Amino acid sequence: MKIAAPLLLACLMLPSTASAADTDAASGTSGPLFDTVAALDRTVFDAYNRCDLETFATYFVPDVEFYHDNGGVTWTREDVVEGTRKYICGKVRRELIPGTLRIYPIKDFGAVEEGEHRFCQRASGQCEGVAKFVMVWRREGEAWRMTRVLSYGHRAASEEEMRAAAAAQH
């Protein structure tokens, strides 16, 4: 019992000795991994928004699992790309909502990316939908590919969110 109390106290003090840089990295909002995966997010969704499906496809493993709260589960890269061609191309544009992106490492594998995004109708320019997302990225050498995607919490954008989206476009 005499040993347990000092050991418990030492364990409780460990988190308080973390540096500011460690805290930023632990928050998922900065650092080299954040920069890398944020750049991947920009590149993959640039391809998505331009309907460059050949490039878009390269960011998914062949057996990707894509879980969508409204659309169900998609089990392959080919089906993800086909769904994008059928339901997205020329109709919708995706925008990352500033300040929502978080990225965390997965030891000896890659990273988890989470955030919120909005979807804007190409015809009207209105950003009417908002959703949360999680993407699991696998690193193989210099290549990064998504193995799992969750897109959930889809809802209509509030008036305030629609105004913020319109302001961001100008």
Model-derived segments and their meaning:
Residues E65-D69, G110-Q121, M135-V136:
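Short, well-ordered beta-strand segments in beta-rich or mixed alpha/beta enzyme
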Residues V80, T84, P98-Y104, E116-F119, ...:
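Hydrophobic/aromatic beta-strand elements that line small-molecule binding cavities or substrate pockets
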Residues V130-E160:
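Short beta-strand edge/turn micro-motifs at domain boundaries
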Residues G31-D35, L53-F109, C127:
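A solvent-exposed, acidic/Ser-Thr-rich amphipathic alpha-helical stretch
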Residues P6-S16:
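Bacterial N-terminal signal peptides
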Residues M1-A4:
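Positively charged n-region of N-terminal signal peptides that target proteins for export
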Residues A18-P62, E78-D79, E160-H170:
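Short, low-complexity N-terminal intrinsically disordered segments enriched in polar/charged residues
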